[in-house]
């Protein structure tokens, strides 16, 4: 059985997917920051060698003696691939926004990603393109899971200052952060933040914020609105510089935050209508790793609409965890 291996190595997790040349998903794996034994790294825990290797092995264990013709992905280097497979297996670097556009069958359009990090990418019908943000948590990642998590930590820190700052997030945020330091006899939120925690840990708090926003907490709701507004500002910059405000193009929303938070997505779409009324917002119909796999098959000259449909259907059926809406 000849296959391709697709890898989506993000800030908090790594997805790996084995697909046959006919488009059938036959093996998949995921390793996230929340799992014991996952790796850590300054470029994002999902891109660490340990995390990538664990996700790949999970996927490969399900396909036995399959022949891997090519490995395609982003957030992972060719040296990591060759270290596992040797020089005989080809490596195809894929850009994250291309995988998102592939999922909706578009060559031109806008991709807005809000996961652990954040960016907006645009490509017009004339081929002119622009990629903004993805600068990391210190310089950018506006509207990202990290951005949301940091606002949640700050809200928890000042929740007791005055009744107007009260939020149901306070105790759950402290508990979530302390869980990342299980061997500490006494946990201090100040010490935790001064210890430069992994950005994936901070981004994981976005899930808490969304849950408390849905439960009615005003502070949590405002955090989501603020984050969505920030991503919309990046969208405005891209659309304006490329003169795409009135173009009828897809706006593909992807990343755990954009696809996992109803409130965030709805507010972002409302802002999109104000900024670029011609754009058509749509959430990515499947995990980005499926887009990576499709691009790998396309690069081999064997991808068409039937292969795409088969790939997406088999991914959605075979990997419910991968297609889940975990934020961050």
Descriptions of predicted regions:
Residues 1-66, 104, 108-110, 154-328:
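ATP-binding/phosphotransfer module of carbohydrate and carboxylate kinases, centering on a glycine-rich
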